[in-house]
Amino acid sequence: MSSESPNLPAAAGTVPDNHPPPPPVVTAAEAGSDDSPKGVASKLSAAGISNWAKNLKVPQPFASTQNDSGVENTEKSAFAKFTSGLGIRLSPKSPQTNDTTTEGTSSATESSFIGTITKGLVDTSKNAVKAVQVKARHAVSQNKRRYQEGGFDLDLTYITENIIAMGFPAGDMSSGFFGYVEGFYRNQMEEVINFLETQHKGKYKVYNLCSERLYDVSLFEGKVASFPFDDHNCPPIHLVTSFCQSAYSWLKEDIENVVVVHCKAGMARTGLMICSLLLYLKFFPTAEECMDFYNQKRCVDGKGLVLPSQIRYVKYFERILTYFNGENQPGRRCMLRGFRLHRCPYWIRPSITISDHNGVLFTTKKHPRTKDLSPEDFWFSAPKKGVMVFALPGEPGLTELAGDFKIQFHDRQGDFYCWLNTTMMENRVILKTSELDGFDKRKLPSPGFMVEVVLADINATIPTNPSSETASKTPEETSAANSSPVDGSASVPGPDKETENPDKDDVFSDNEGDSTGPTKTTSSASSQTPEAKKSADETAVLTKATEKVSISGNKGSSQPVQGVTVSKGEATEKPSGAGVNASSSSESEFKVMAADASVFSFGDEDDFESD
């Protein structure tokens, strides 16, 4: 047996079926090369056979695979490689360190990717918002020049080296909600502060002209002065002088000091004040030159200060500098007598509101004699064709004025208005359409249309008739006589007297010499006194007025006649307002007086006809 053992290892792969291989084969292969008889005997023992049987399972696949075909070996080898590789990847016994590292790397990669996407979206959104914001700001700026240097993009212009015009610095909550929202399309407060601190640190002063927007003055280190007045309007004339004096005081302190003037848009109100300042500092000798210079500097198209009333106030300030040495003057007290509309088409019949900086002074919508009438009823045709007149018969005027005042005409085709100053104007002013604010925005054109404003000095409002025995009697005293019927023996003035001066009236005359009304006898009241509507002479007045003036189409010309009862040979009249209240009586009286166009003369007809 020992002689065969050296040949057994070579025959291990060809063990015949049904005969287990000799124990020495396995022992020699597994246990070593011990060929001693003692070693062989130990290998043939039960324990040795048992160990051999156990160890036989391991080489058996290897032995069988050696006899398989090349294709099977290839398939199994590939399968084994696949399963072994899969086992390495899926085995729970694989090292945890590699998985943790892989997971950490994956998480970091995912976080980095999400962060990149988020940052990109945020940056894109910011850029998109900024682009929209820039477009909005440029759209709001319209024709104004912008400051686009040093990384700034502001609605701001250097009018001179020391005078800056800009739009409202918005975007701060101290300006209120709307002021904060306006920061999206107007100058940003932070950007304005950054600009001033960068370019003019410690050398600037801000002038706020807005009455509708304020902000925390501490944002500009307290160097803010406020001279407020409403948008599309004019300031009190004394405010212009005060502004110029304040700005001059700041500029003369240091040659590098600058004034920064703004309203909301930084154009119209700002232009009025800056043009006045240019006049005050004697940059140019005339208001026209100052306005032309400002318009060219501030706007691309040269249309900065365009409202007629604001242009008028720059010229008013020029007069103050020329005639009053820059000193404020008290307002001249006047009475507003009424209005004439020249070349007035039928579609212009406006209601009227008179106001000043303290509030409304007069309005046809609330006055007792006009509040119940439509505008077509209280505008009446004058003897001259194409002229409409408004006044209050029997009253000294519409309202008393002193200084600045505003006339606003409310019309269905669009409102128009103007600001005037009694100290700077004559008692009679004619304004063309180019001198009326907002008239160019009306729907229908009115070529040649003009508004005449008639004033009177407060002491000469109600002139008297020197040829009359009762020249000293006032209209109020005459109106008291209306409570009792007039004596039937009253004499009626001849028609020739009435036709001699059809357009004159003693109440509405500005000059005593122009007063030509009929005189009052000892037994009757004057038939031409506006308040004496109950005298029989009123019948003749209405008759002559009907013959002289075309009043067809006017309601006020037909209704008053119904209240007059006339019999041939009688000089008495039944009261037209019997049994009605004072308001109805006043309205009827207004229509009676309005039927006679002569009561609407202002005593300047000679000059009026020469026009």
Curated annotation (Swiss-Prot):
Induction: Accumulates in response to salt (e.g. NaCl) and osmotic stresses (e.g. mannitol).
Domain C2 tensin-type: residue ranges: 331-458
GO MF terms held by the record: phosphatidic acid binding; phosphatidylinositol phosphate phosphatase activity; phosphatidylinositol-3,4,5-trisphosphate 3-phosphatase activity; protein tyrosine phosphatase activity
Enzyme nomenclature, EC number: 3.1.3.48, 3.1.3.67
Catalytic activity: O-phospho-L-tyrosyl-[protein] + H2O = L-tyrosyl-[protein] + phosphate; a 1,2-diacyl-sn-glycero-3-phospho-(1D-myo-inositol-3,4,5-trisphosphate) + H2O = a 1,2-diacyl-sn-glycero-3-phospho-(1D-myo-inositol-4,5-bisphosphate) + phosphate
Active site residues of this protein: C263 (phosphocysteine intermediate)
UniProt domain Phosphatase tensin-type: residue ranges: 145-324
Effect ascribed to mutating C263S: Loss of phosphatase activity
A Pfam entry, by short name: PTEN2_C2
Tissue: Expressed in seedlings, roots, stems, leaves, flowers and siliques. However, at protein level, not observed in older leaves and mature siliques.
Claim: 4Fe-4S is one of the keywords in the record: no
Polar residues bias (residue ranges): 462-486, 514-530, 549-565
Function: Binds phosphatidic acid. Protein tyrosine phosphatase that also exhibits lipid phosphatase activity. Hydrolyzed poorly p-nitrophenyl phosphate (p-NPP). Can use PtdIns isomers as substrates. Removes efficiently phosphate from the D3 position of the inositol ring, less from the D4 position and not at all from the D5 position on monophosphorylated PtdIns isomers (PIPs). The presence of a phosphate group in the D5 position on PIP(2) isomers reduces lipid phosphatase activity.
The protein's name in its UniProt record: Phosphatidylinositol 3,4,5-trisphosphate 3-phosphatase and protein-tyrosine-phosphatase PTEN2A
